[in-house]
Amino acid sequence: MVNFTVDQIRAIMDKKANIRNMSVIAHVDHGKSTLTDSLVCKAGIIASARAGETRFTDTRKDEQERCITIKSTAISLFYELSENDLNFIKQSKDGSGFLINLIDSPGHVDFSSEVTAALRVTDGALVVVDCVSGVCVQTETVLRQAIAERIKPVLMMNKMDRALLELQLEPEELYQTFQRIVENVNVIISTYGEGESGPMGNIMIDPVLGTVGFGSGLHGWAFTLKQFAEMYVAKFAAKGEGQLGAAERAKKVEDMMKKLWGDRYFDPANGKFSKSANSPDGKKLPRTFCQLILDPIFKVFDAIMNFRKEETAKLIEKLDIKLDSEDKDKEGKPLLKAVMRRWLPAGDALLQMITIHLPSPVTAQKYRCELLYEGPPDDEAAMGIKSCDPKGPLMMYISKMVPTSDKGRFYAFGRVFSGVVSTGLKVRIMGPNYTPGKKEDLYLKPIQRTILMMGRYVEPIEDVPCGNIVGLVGVDQFLVKTGTITTFEHAHNMRVMKFSVSPVVRVAVEAKNPADLPKLVEGLKRLAKSDPMVQCIIEESGEHIIAGAGELHLEICLKDLEEDHACIPIKKSDPVVSYRETVSEESNVLCLSKSPNKHNRLYMKARPFPDGLAEDIDKGEVSARQELKARARYLAEKYEWDVAEARKIWCFGPDGTGPNILTDITKGVQYLNEIKDSVVAGFQWATKEGALCEENMRGVRFDVHDVTLHADAIHRGGGQIIPTARRCLYASVLTAQPRLMEPIYLVEIQCPEQVVGGIYGVLNRKRGHVFEESQVAGTPMFVVKAYLPVNESFGFTADLRSNTGGQAFPQCVFDHWQILPGDPFDNSSRPSQVVAETRKRKGLKEGIPALDNFLDKL
């Protein structure tokens, strides 16, 4: 299938049971893009000779130069299963041709927002793990996200060539390595998954079922137990039995797969399988996986890499491998590649695993609907999503914007969950802040064109039915990053994506030539569109701030801004870190503030959260949308709150969802409800810009103790109450031992044993501390996990490499907020320097404002 016409693809799109939407996820440099190549070349978009070198999905120039994937790209593949293989599919199917929409996502932590966007539009994930270094921190983060989105994983052990050629492992050691990785992945799945009783059933991976692949993306070969089981079934069948029917054959292969993994042993003397490790006459038996699967592979490697021509020729003949004439003259590694590629082609093994084990939209949307759709579970839109119904109302989620070749326009990239999207269709474009029945963030516009994404190319297409991934033209002006597109009037939004990282590093940018300012502003708008994570902020002082997840992320954003979006030379400041303000004990006095007209008084106190509550709010375990009683019960049980107080939470802040709480513990106050909105507004304002240096507050609980109000409504309007509430909140913070919190990275460093000492040295200089150190079993590598303040992380990588001779590779993920030790009022302390710097940068008055500005006397 080299030449694909759009009409052919369009025909398959209607067979929604035969669509697979999947993403490839993994730790950085475990070989996702390389593997994706062998899939793409099998489905015929790259000429097969170049696979493994092209990295088709790395479409950007900087991706090809840095050899990392930065943005997630989508490609449609087509694969036909043979009659025999169709019997392995346990869900509904429709013909033998399958359309696979594949999204290759980046593995670098700084880009994990890209991964989140990719996960939202897919139903299954191919998790790639390097079998030498095992399951790493990013694999875990991404897999956890996938399971939270109810996405079914299958596993691929990549880089087997390294295990055989570099580490020279014995078959039994290699089996143990695989076994350990499978266990690690299953531990993650069972920790974050919903168990067998959940809506998805059992999603644990198991080589016996064929949900684990083994192979090498670089050399272009791979297999699951199914491939070998088929060879042996055919071999045993040839000895005596005649032809089997397809269904019986599938049954036999499944039985055979059960014997090829785990504690099953093979007795070569009589060709029997046994469950004990010793044969009747006391000999030690080889494990079946080693004897029947690894042994032939080892033999091929051994014969070819030691240049034994006759043995090689015999093996090639025995395995029935047909080489091209040009391959016959090769020797060493090139010949090894050619032989393995012919014998166990990676494309086939992986595409079979994907089509057989990953769910179709029909299967997946049944259990994903409740996570995807915010509205009631029984309205038209929800029913359409659940049944993946092309006749239902159009429901489509845009997960990100993809820049087009002409500067400044974007394709909206997303997935149709119900209905059909077509060129010229008039739709409702709903941004993330849309609420049903209101007009904000809602546009009624026609779609100009629908297009298919093909890696580096796009193809126009008339219409696309549900279950497919598509690009839209002409929607980009109405959405910033994500949104919902629908034709159903009462539709609610599709749920917003939760990112596992937060933008904590910021730089200020300005144009080198002041006349270019309008271009810079325009460029920042485009940048905010093109990256799901980045935040572009204009400070009151007129500074333009870009906030990103880490150093690398920001570097790439700035490069994009300079070259693609604004196209002007740019000056940037040194990166600075966002802080949070908090309190460390309860206010020592009951704070009183009077309104400007002296007729209203508010009394409040502040106190810190119990440990863990702020994190629960971030995760969404406790939120403003929850049912009141359930939330009160949760707070009472887990954090020992008073139930009566827990029920009287007025709001969360900043932005209505942040990790600060305003509770009302007043007794019988007149007119209280009339000023509730004003106090809440003051609270949102105060928590967004704290008292110390106008950073967000975090982990503070404010209690309204008492309120005395003027009887006349006109004297207690918003203009009187809002600033008073804010002053009172500031006073209660300043009397409660305020502190600063700084963001902390979790750093995972892989390195050989001899340089571990160097790592400790670097971390100690940077205020970091190691909390776990372990050896990767079966390899000389150590994994060191440490906490490192984000503030100290600039240039950390370079420092580490120079101190360890380039042998240590760090991965940083934002992990938590931690209180900066020291009192911000003490001039010699670290926090007071930070406060002073931040205030200076923001153009505020020097020094923390005095308490008298906020606290009034009776």
UniProtKB/Swiss-Prot annotation:
Residues 17-362 form the tr-type G domain. Transmembrane segments: none annotated. There is a cross-link at K239 (Glycyl lysine isopeptide (Lys-Gly) (interchain with G-Cter in SUMO1)). It holds the Pfam family EFG_IV. One of its GO terms (cellular component) is plasma membrane. One of its GO terms (molecular function) is actin filament binding. It is found in: Cytoplasm; Nucleus. Disulfide bonds: none annotated. GTP binds at residues 26-33, 158-161, 216-218. InterPro entries: EFG_II, EFG_III/V, EFG_V-like, EFTu-like_2, G_TR_CS, P-loop_NTPase, Ribosomal_Su5_D2-typ_SF, Ribsml_uS5_D2-typ_fold_subgr. There is a cross-link at K322, K529 (Glycyl lysine isopeptide (Lys-Gly) (interchain with G-Cter in SUMO)). Catalyzes the GTP-dependent ribosomal translocation step during translation elongation. During this step, the ribosome changes from the pre-translocational (PRE) to the post-translocational (POST) state as the newly formed A-site-bound peptidyl-tRNA and P-site-bound deacylated tRNA move to the P and E sites, respectively. Catalyzes the coordinated movement of the two tRNA molecules, the mRNA and conformational changes in the ribosome. PANTHER family: ELONGATION FACTOR 2, TRANSLATION ELONGATION FACTOR-RELATED. This is Elongation factor 2. It comes from Rattus norvegicus.
